[in-house]
């Protein structure tokens, strides 16, 4: 058997390959750090109070807007204060997005991909009211209506996008105590999430119906101010991200085809590690596929869910591969038989599968429902928020435990190698140099694997926390920089690209020789090669199991010869 390219590649060629890949890794970090803006931006929109039109409250195709021809007349705070009922059932809170800047009308770009809206409310109670302290987890009923229009539409040509009667729970605390009223500020609450930002302008109308028989909105005094924070992906970051995908996608596809052709040339069935490498490359290619270009022409509200599914498949495959990769290099194995997923790794991989399925179910409950109702959120109820928070914490803890377990497996591999290195002095010089070179290369690759795993787990945990930052009420400042995101994404591609090259079968063939002659010839080859620092590790004849792809995995089955 000729072994893998990792074993047969000369030291000089290997150094050139590793240096080139490291330069590509640095380039990925620099692209994100120097050319890409921050991944997400936001606008803070103050709700404009408009007087509702009598008889149109139940007309879901009717919208009030605050800018342009035919804009509504805003209601002043003093008018609300002087009204005995605080203009209950007469007010509409209007949010028109995006806001103008420097007297220029801005519009959303399809490069911005998605839009998330969260609310922060200030409510007030009269000082003379018997109910001065709002109850814990105050329930609020909101009539939410979302509309859109495009650049060439008239100012009044708003088209309905979504409508829903939503319930939200407020957690408020006193902010100001005055003679007339007590002002309470409430924690942010999620309102809507759009998986596609296909239109130029969006309009949000909020009504807070008060109904005594149905006991709607009777426990809070009156709305004082409402602030909407509209969060969107930055278009410049999307362009850099898609550029990376467009460049990396054909490279990974090409190296996969090259790898599988070399495997099929061999007179044996592919080994487990070769299958896993192919599946890993396929999952990465699915992630690299720049489907986001379609959103520039078509409205695809399911793109967020599809992106989560693609990333989930890649995570599941990557985590599974690392367990198999470390396990296949365990030099002391329980069984000499050929490894299979079912025989050796079902316990390890079942935990990964269960974790990924749990996150998938959670994602379906959130973003799957948002395909029908963008105002739906699992975070809206106290129980749902606790369940969602538990999922995020559990996912983060599981990722940390996985990384520790992977470190343990790598340590065990290194320990096995250390135990077997004691037999190297009894080997011939050729065999000893052969295995010392393999061990050095393998250790370097395993350390690179640990580094990749550590950054992946860190990125996963930070991503989960950053996504939930606007949905739970903790003062956590997390900003995933563009350099970190592009760097980790490039690292995945470079790491898998390197594995497909280094673990591809080597087709160098060496003449068969008698056992007595082969030792002498091997020693001469090693000494001559060492002098020029161009050691070729395939010069050693091998009688290993043809189902093994690496000489290192059959180290314990070798018999030293002189």
Curated annotation (Swiss-Prot):
Q: Name one Pfam family in it.
A: WLS_GOLD
Is Glycoprotein one of the keywords UniProt gives this record?
yes
Write out the transmembrane intervals: 14-34, 240-260, 271-291, 312-332, 345-365, 391-411, 442-462, 483-503
- Where does it reside? Presynaptic cell membrane; Postsynaptic cell membrane; Cell membrane; Endoplasmic reticulum membrane
Report which residue ranges the record marks as coiled coil.
Answer: none
A GO CC annotation recorded here is:
postsynaptic membrane
Region described as Disordered: 538-562
Positions in the Lumenal compartment: 35-239, 292-311, 366-390, 463-482
InterPro entries for this protein: WLS-like_TM (IPR047843), WLS_GOLD (IPR053936), Wntless (IPR009551)
* Positions of glycan attachment: 58, 103
Superkingdom classification of source = Eukaryota
| Swiss-Prot/TrEMBL keywords | Cell membrane, Cell projection, Developmental protein, Endoplasmic reticulum, Endosome, Glycoprotein, Golgi apparatus, Membrane, Postsynaptic cell membrane, Segmentation polarity protein, Synapse, Transmembrane, Transmembrane helix, Wnt signaling pathway
Q: How does it sit in the membrane?
A: Multi-pass membrane protein
GO MF annotations, alphabetized: Wnt-protein binding
**Cytoplasmic compartment spans:** 1-13, 261-270, 333-344, 412-441, 504-562
The Polar residues compositionally biased stretches are 539-556
Q: How is the quaternary structure described?
A: Interacts with wg; in the Golgi. Interacts with Vps35, a component of the retromer complex; wls stability is regulated by Vps35.
Give the similarity note.
Belongs to the wntless family.
Function comment = A segment polarity gene required for wingless (wg)-dependent patterning processes, acting in both wg-sending cells and wg-target cells. In non-neuronal cells wls directs wg secretion. The wls traffic loop encompasses the Golgi, the cell surface, an endocytic compartment and a retrograde route leading back to the Golgi, and involves clathrin-mediated endocytosis and the retromer complex (a conserved protein complex consisting of Vps35 and Vps26). In neuronal cells (the larval motorneuron NMJ), the wg signal moves across the synapse via the release of wls-containing exosome-like vesicles.
What this protein is called in its record is Protein wntless
Organism, by scientific name, is Drosophila mojavensis (Fruit fly)
Gene this protein is translated from: wls
